Amino acid sequence: LLGLEWLIVALSGSNFFLYSLTSSHTLYNISYFFDAFSRAFGFPIIAIAGLMSVTHGYKPSTLADAGLFVASFAATFVLVAVDAVVPAKPWFYLLMWTVYSVYLSYFAWRLWRAGESGHALGLFLVMLCGQAIATIYDFYKIPGDDKEHTLFYILALSTWACMLTQTYYAYRALEIDGKDPEGISP
């Protein structure tokens, strides 16, 4: 689950980069769709489900994984295509990212409890930065930023890159820590 979501983030970023070079609206639309997917469902639902494999021993079937992605893609299509949801989208994105942040806080606590204080602190810090980016995204303009939002994207992309990297190492730390997902040894 995590790998597929990270692939979607890479596709979104790659398409946005190519759009910035070519001004192709098709590339922008692809990037916009994948960005909406990740903000609304990819991180808050799919990434949490993936992280739950080391916090709760959650192992969904291939069919459940596929169903989760199909439902998330369908819901993203509604978010992107239906004009009636436009006024609520920024608030929905912020709510969903906040759900993800709450789970990352729990994940950091689990790391701390497992004796992985460095990973716990790193994950908590990138969670705070990610929550700040999610709050700024649709609601605030950074003073001095240009019409292309260059400063915002430098901060956002740097934060997301650090978040993905820290999440990978945090996941591995809990996975290596033990096979008992609740931390209760026999």
Regions found by a protein language model. Give the residues of each.
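Membrane-interfacial loop-to-transmembrane alpha-helix junctions, especially the N-terminal start
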Residues: 1-8, 58-69, 116-126, 181-185
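Hydrophobic alpha-helical transmembrane segments of multi-pass membrane proteins
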Residues: 2-21, 34-41, 95, 125-139, 154-158
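Helix-loop junctions on the outward
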Residues: 12-38, 84-87, 142
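Membrane-interface segments at the starts/ends of alpha-helical transmembrane spans
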Residues: 28-31, 75-82, 145-154
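Membrane-proximal helix-loop-helix units in multi-pass membrane proteins
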Residues: 40-113
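C-terminal transmembrane-bundle signature of multipass membrane proteins
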Residues: 47, 108-186
